[in-house]
Amino acid sequence: MTNAEIISSGNACLGIEFGSTRIKAVLINDKFEPIANGSFTWENSLIDGIWTYNIEEIHKGLQTCYADLKKDVKEKYNVTLTSFKCAGISAMMHGYLAFDKDDNLLVPFRTWRNTITGAASELLSTLFNFPVPERWSVSHFYQAILNNEEHVSKIANVYTLAAYIHYKLTGEKVIGVGDASGMFPVEFSADKKSCDYKKDFVSKFEALESVKKFGFKIKEVFPKVLMAGENAGKLTEDGAKFLDPEGDLKAGILMCPPEGDAGTGMVATNSVEAQTGNISAGTSVFSMVVLEKDLKKAYPGIIDIVTTPDGYPVAMVHCNNCTGEHNYWMNFFKEIVDTMCGSENSPKIGEFYDKLIMKSLEADEDCGNLLAYNYLSGETITGFNSGRPLFVRGENAQFNIANFMRVQMFSSLGALRVGMDILYDDEKVPVKSMTGAGGYFKTEAGLKYMACAMKTPVSAMETAGEGGPWGMAILAAYATDAQKKSLSDYLNQNVFAECKKETSQPDEKISKSFEVFYERYKKGLAVEKAAVESL
């Protein structure tokens, strides 16, 4: 069938993802190729000290994004969008959307970005002996209880953004396990065919005196946990009108479990199998490694535990700083060239990046005895609440552009490696391959450096730019899979079997160079500390 026939017959699959700056919709065909898309640009607001998105804008954004998708389909294929084989909603994880029994929002949406739940996070992490970050839904929920907030007594349901939108469309109070793992810790059933909130943690939470007085039960307040591929309900008449106010969309469409952006990222990079992982490296950087078993201990503030969309534990290392500092240096150098040659005669910024970063491959093994810290903000992993970008050199340093650029590229990975060393050295976690996405990987050098820093092969896929909404559309397609393969088999055999990718193995010379830098980086943290205290 042609794409037009696939769409008109209702056999395309839809993924919609609420990102922090854009809501995006992607329609895919039976070959998992994106064939139409829509988007809506938005920004969070800081209101009364709370990072939030207005509930009306959430609704408007969804409808505008869908209308943009309809328009794209009409323009490309001259088809009016009326149905899908399956659809799914994903969104930024965590946060707090609290409703009463009549579905009235009790307080403005508190997003993952808020750092207002420190007391709850610390108390729960200690209670569970399990990392419960400030951004998790249960941290927000418990903090509201600790604060004696007026709305708490009226709470009937707490959702993530994806679970809330799914409820609006289907009337089903359910959530995909990956998204659920950012609300409250989860666990497999004995047969590994289902997942739920960890029973012993639920009991401990509900036994807290401050929780008991309200009679809250986690499994009543939080959505029911579903695995990837499960039936998560169907689009209702009201849901269809809500998504498409023009009235063309039909009710009865199958919906898959709503997921979080971490889970859709894993799917989009084919990183759901044990011993695999993915790295997103841009302004900030995080790695996610699928575990074969639970970690031996908790590492609050350093390693978070979430799950794949089919319930396997994932260790997440998140760092606030990656390419931001070397972007400033690039712009600084570009300004020098523009001043000397005139902006009309100087290279465009993309070419400028490529040439300078590739020049770093000519650097000395010890990076010329240079050192840099890219701490535009604090870095929890290395113990900094705030940061100061630094460039330091010894008196006998070989200060040239190749060494300078390499140390900037290595600095982007220093804190990430500190977190990964816990997995490698303390927990003995095996990692056979990782897949990268983001600006750090735009050059061959970036891919090489990441492989050496992570001590494992790292690949960049040609599909990496498709991102979360494409991953959500794949999860929607997976929910219709008649063969009921495992998610990893489905991705390997159906989606990525012929996917082109560029893989970099750890290079012996560059690996030695990184290790020399890394030892200097750890020793030099005292310099960074002095800068924070003095400047």
What are these language model-derived features?
Residues 1-9, 75-78, 143-147, 237-248, ...:
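Conserved phosphate-binding catalytic cores of ATP/NTP-utilizing and phosphoryl-transfer enzymes
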Residues 1-40, 44-46, 56, 64, ...:
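Glycine/Thr-rich phosphate-binding loops that ligate phosphate moieties of nucleotide
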Residues 18-20, 128-259, 373-374, 405, ...:
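Gly/Ser/Thr-rich active-site cleft segment
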Residues 126-139, 276-278, 478-493:
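A polyampholytic, Gly/Pro-enriched intrinsically disordered region
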Residues 64-84, 148-152, 201, 205-218, ...:
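Phosphate/pyrophosphate-binding loops at sites that engage ATP/ADP/AMP, CoA/4′-phosphopantetheine
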